[in-house]
C-alpha cells in the first residue's frame, strides 16, 4: 500500500484522550493528529521522535491529519494505524504473499458470522474447499525483544477466539493472522502478563484447530506492505 499523497513528518509531543496526538512541525508550529489506534500503544510512544502523518482533503473531518508511522529510538518504524491491518492482509492475500492462504476464488470482508454477533475480517471461499475465516490483529507491542498481543485486556479479542473455534467445529477453516507493524518484532506471543485469559484461550483455540499466522510489514514513509512470515510462540 502506497501512501498517496506522500506522508508529512513532525515531532511527537504527546498523545492524549486516546485518539489525539500533538505534533510539532519543522517551522515550530503545532498541529493535532487523529490517532487511529484504540489500544494502549504500550511501548509505542516516544515523545521527541519523528512521526509521519497523512492529510485528508475531506472538509467534514474535524482533524484533517492522521498519524500513520512512529520512529523508534533504534531508528525502527511502527505502524500506528491499526485499522490498516485488514487492508494490508487483503492486499497480501491477493498478491499471494501469504502462502498459507492461496488457492481461493473469492475474498469478502466484514461478513457476519458466529454465535456472538460478530463480523469476520476476511472470508475466503473456493470450490471444493472449506470456507476460511480470518481474524486479523495488528501487533506492535515489543518488550525485551519479544512481540506480544494484546497490549491491553481485550474482551473483543477473546470473543473472536471463541468465534474462530466455533467455525472449526462447524467444519470450516479458521485463521488468526497477526499483522506485525513494528520493524523490531520478529516473533509474536500472547501477552499472558497483560491478558491471561486471552493467552489461555489462544492455546485452547490452537488445540481446537485454529491456525495462527504472523507476517511482518516492511514500512517506509512512502509505502507499507506485508513481506514475510515470522515465528508465533503460543
From Swiss-Prot:
One of its GO terms (molecular function) is DNA binding. This is Sugar fermentation stimulation protein homolog. Belongs to the SfsA family. InterPro entries: SfsA (IPR005224), SfsA_C (IPR040452), SfsA_N (IPR041465). It comes from Shewanella baltica (strain OS195). Pfam families: SfsA, SfsA_N. The gene is sfsA. NCBIfam families: sfsA.
Amino acid at each position: 500500500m502506497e501512501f498517496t499523497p506522500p506522508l508529512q513528518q513532525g515531532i511527537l509531543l504527546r498523545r492524549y484522550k486516546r485518539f489525539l496526538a500533538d505534533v510539532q512541525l519543522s517551522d515550530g508550529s503545532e498541529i493535532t493528529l487523529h490517532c487511529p489506534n484504540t489500544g494502549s500503544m504500550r511501548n509505542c510512544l516516544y515523545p521527541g521522535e519523528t512521526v509521519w502523518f497523512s492529510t485528508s482533503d475531506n472538509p467534514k473531518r474535524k482533524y484533517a491529519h492522521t498519524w500513520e508511522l512512529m520512529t523508534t529510538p533504534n531508528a525502527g518504524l511502527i505502524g500506528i494505524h491499526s485499522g490498516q491491518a485488514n487492508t494490508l492482509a487483503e492486499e497480501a492475500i491477493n498478491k499471494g504473499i501469504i502462502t498459507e492462504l492461496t488457492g481461493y476464488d473469492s475474498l469478502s470482508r466484514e461478513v457476519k458470522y458466529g454465535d456472538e454477533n460478530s463480523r469476520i475480517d476476511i472470508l475466503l471461499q473456493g470450490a471444493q474447499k472449506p470456507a476460511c475465516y480470518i481474524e486479523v490483529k495488528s501487533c506492535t507491542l515489543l518488550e525485551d525483544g519479544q512481540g506480544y498481543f494484546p497490549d491491553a485486556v481485550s474482551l473483543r479479542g477473546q470473543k473472536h477466539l471463541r468465534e474462530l473455534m466455533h467455525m472449526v467445529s462447524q467444519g470450516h477453516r479458521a485463521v488468526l493472522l497477526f499483522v506485525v507493524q513494528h520493524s523490531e518484532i520478529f516473533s509474536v506471543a500472547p501477552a499472558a502478563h497483560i491478558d491471561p485469559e486471552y493467552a489461555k484461550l489462544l492455546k485452547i483455540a490452537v488445540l481446537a484447530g485454529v491456525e495462527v499466522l504472523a507476517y511482518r510489514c516492511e514500512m517506509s514513509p512512502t509505502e507499507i506492505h506485508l513481506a514475510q512470515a515470522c515465528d508465533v510462540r503460543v
